A protein has these predicted regions:
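Conserved motor-region signature of P-loop NTPase helicases/translocases
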Residues: 1-4, 12-23, 27-38, 42, ...
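Short glycine/proline-rich turn/loop motifs
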Residues: 144-155, 171-177, 181, 288, ...
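Mobile, glycine-enriched helix-loop/loop "lid" segments at the mouths of ligand-binding/catalytic clefts
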Residues: 570, 618-649
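P-loop NTPase Walker
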Residues: 71-74, 81-84, 88, 92, ...
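Conserved helicase/translocase P-loop NTPase motor core
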Residues: 164-220, 233-234, 365-384
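Conserved ATP-driven helicase/translocase motor core recognized via long
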Residues: 2-185, 200, 406, 416-417, ...
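C-terminal accessory regions
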Residues: 460-462, 472, 588-591, 642-673
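Flexible hinge/switch segments at interdomain interfaces of large molecular machines
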Residues: 169, 187-191, 283, 332-349, ...
């Protein structure tokens, strides 16, 4: 409910969005005209066209080798005939016909071919055919249900989606009441309150209010940068305060739209770009577009490599824009000529090093490259001065630093190379913070085995494995806290002292604010002195002080008590909130920077190393998917067989989400290069 609530707030009229999406579940509509089915039809048509291309390529390849041609041509031509028939069926856009055609399609086996086991043509043809059969198998699964079964699912889905939407509406009303009582708003509220002042919803869209009309006369220009990252709500705000868009000046690059996870909609900017004609200074007809193709940051070789790669990869289908002459980068800077290349591609062979992870091997390779360039005094030109390269001139770019940066930091450190990562350590993941949070959790509720165990073995209390075995042997069936109490009654002083200390903290928690309680824990346990004796002790001490600061801010916000603070921290952990731990090295120091591509956007470094390029895409496989145009996609429950199953509606949504995700991944690569 919360996820859907957050998602629809990027739309200018969230309630209308819910009403519109529910209309997609009309079970009286012709199934072939259903919006989800249309998505599946389009996908299937493109998939079969791709199969035909693979098959035609195979037919062309075998023409050069007579024996392979004699063995394979007849079967491949038969495949082509089958695929053409399927393509014709798909063009009729009839669910039952397509479903039947896919169920009866049969591929015959290729004839046996002796003596060509390692021939690259043979291997490529076999692989192409495997790919074709896999695609057809996937299409058969997508269209496996009958029309009647689809309507049954549609009816069930309508009931569930309707209930979900009602829950979201109810949640919004209650949340708004709670916010009003506390006199607070969030960023989403500010957007929607602004929209309420500026526009009124009508049957055909919206109309400006008097306030908007008055404001639009006060601005000579409305200028917006990074417009490719706007959402529908923001776009409507900008349009409403402009003079019917005549004075609206927007700057953006669809190829650099990489914030889909924040509901950025590059298609908003793209529609403008496609609609407007090129600016003509002699006619001055508005709206118009100006192409800013000059690049003043990069050397010519980098731009050439970028243009070459993306002219092969980026299209309207994947990337959401055709990488044509208008989109190509033009060299605009002034750099001295140099002998070595501007771009190098390193291919790492991991076949002989399977014991180490790919991350570690890649990090080790990069560390050697940096060490070599530093050792050879590789020269760069910076601020019109030629000088030897330093550590601070290098930046390692990763798609995500959260999971992978640690390996790179470690390998660089082993080579004596100082580095800084934009995440370094997660605040909640540091040993000192994890220990104190576990202690707070058991002060709030001691019947929690995992945090209790973490506290017992921590430097604060120092229970050994033998101690724990003794405690657990006392009673294996009860929670650990009750086993501790039994052991204390048997005369175990260590257990008794621990329980007395926890009881004391529990009494303090009833009267003290959370920040004061944490300070009491530090003072009574001497934990601050303990962490200072550890490696990087000052950093650990800084983290403990940070925790008190977060607790103080929590109390100052109007919320009170330990229980609430623990819930607040748990939510931050669940949401993977970007809370950085203290770091001994600052971003501005002379160190190698390890950054996410998102973080590096807009920054400049003399030498960039783009790593982790072999990483697989992280496709969303959750039970519920959210699509800005198609709405939520959900799985259904088969109570009889106790299983979840997907539906044609969710399949359609997942296909389009995957396509958009691949487009965004391609744009992330573009930003990195």
């Amino acid at each position: 409910v919360l996820t859907l609530y957050d998602f629809i707030r990027s739309h200018p009229f969230p309630q209308k969005w819910l009403v519109d999406k529910l209309k997609f579940y009309d079970d009286k509509q012709n199934l072939n005209e259903n919006i989800f089915v249309q998505v599946l039809f389009d996908y299937a048509r493109m998939a079969v066209i791709h199969c035909l291309q693979l098959t035609e390529n195979s037919v062309k390849m075998i023409q050069e080798i007579e024996k392979i041609k004699l063995a394979y041509e007849e079967t491949l031509l038969y495949d082509k005939e089958l695929l053409n028939e399927l393509k014709s069926t798909l063009e009729n856009k009839n669910w039952n016909e397509i479903s039947r055609a896919l169920k009866i399609i049969k591929f015959v086996a290729l004839k046996r071919l002796v003596g060509y086991s390692d021939d690259p043509v043979k291997l490529k043809v076999i692989q192409n055919r495997k790919d074709v059969k896999e695609i057809i198998k996937n299409l058969t699964r997508l269209f496996f249900q009958s029309e009647e079964q689809c309507f049954e699912d549609l009816k069930t889905l309508r009931q569930i989606i309707s209930e979900l939407f009602e829950l979201v509406k109810d949640f919004e009303e209650r949340l708004d009441l709670a916010k009003n009582e506390k006199n607070v708003v969030d960023f989403g509220d500010l957007e929607h309150l602004t929209l309420k002042l500026l526009v009124c919803k009508t049957e055909n869209g919206f109309e400006k209010t008097e306030i908007a009309r008055s404001l639009s006369q006060q601005f000579e220009f409305v200028m917006v940068d990074e417009y490719q990252d706007t959402n529908e709500a923001q776009d409507l705000i900008f349009r409403s305060i402009s003079d019917d868009e005549r004075n609206l000046f927007v700057v953006g690059d669809v190829k650099q739209s990489i914030y889909g996870f924040r509901q950025a909609m590059p298609e908003i900017f793209l529609r403008r770009k496609q609609k407007y004609k090129l600016f003509d200074a002699n006619k001055e007809i508005y709206p118009a577009k100006i192409i800013l193709d000059k690049n003043f940051r990069s050397r010519k070789g980098i731009l050439g490599a970028t243009n070459f790669i993306f002219s092969q990869l980026m299209s309207n289908s994947i990337g959401e824009i055709e990488y044509n002459q208008e989109e190509k980068l033009s060299f605009g800077a002034s750099y001295d000529e140099k002998n070595d290349s501007d771009v190098e591609i390193k291919i790492l062979d991991i076949s002989e090093s399977e014991d180490d992870g790919m991350n570690v091997l890649e990090a080790r390779c990069i560390a050697k490259i940096i060490a070599q360039m530093i050792g050879e005094n590789y020269e760069i030109k910076s601020e019109n001065v030629v000088r030897p390269v330093t550590y601070g001139d290098f930046c390692i770019l990763l798609r995500s630093t959260n999971k992978h940066a640690a390996d790179f930091v470690k390998e660089l450190e082993l080579c004596g190379i100082p580095s800084w990562s934009d995440t370094s350590n997660s605040f909640f993941g540091t040993a000192e913070i994890s220990t104190i949070l576990s202690l707070l959790k058991i002060i709030d509720n001691p019947i929690q085995d995992i945090p209790l165990l973490a506290v017992l073995v921590s430097p604060i209390f120092g229970f050994t494995p033998d101690d724990l075995s003794e405690i657990r042997v006392t009673d294996k069936e009860v929670p650990l806290y009750f086993a501790l109490k039994k052991q204390a009654k048997l005369g175990d002083k260590k257990c008794r002292n621990f329980l007395l200390e926890i009881d004391n903290y529990r009494r303090l928690a009833a009267t003290l604010p959370s920040d004061k309680l944490i300070q009491q824990i530090y003072d009574k346990t001497g934990y601050t002195a303990v962490v200072q004796a550890m490696k990087e002790g000052q950093l650990r001490l800084n983290n403990l002080r940070l925790l008190i600061e977060y607790a103080r801010n929590y109390e100052a916000s109007g919320y009170k008590g330990l229980t609430g603070f623990i819930r607040f921290v748990s939510r931050l952990e669940e949401q993977k909130a970007d809370i950085a731990a203290s770091n001994s090295i600052s971003e501005g120091a002379n160190v190698v920077k390890i950054m996410s591509i998102h973080r590096s956007k807009g920054l400049e470094f003399p030498i960039c190393i783009l790593a982790n390029c072999s990483r697989k895409f992280n496709k969303d496989v959750g039970d519920i998917l959210l699509h800005p145009a198609l709405g939520p996609g959900i799985k259904l429950l088969d109570y009889e067989n106790m299983r979840k199953y997907t539906t044609f509606q969710r399949d359609a949504i997942k296909l389009d989400i995957d396509k958009k995700a691949m487009s965004e991944e391609l744009r992330v690569l573009y930003v990195a290069m």
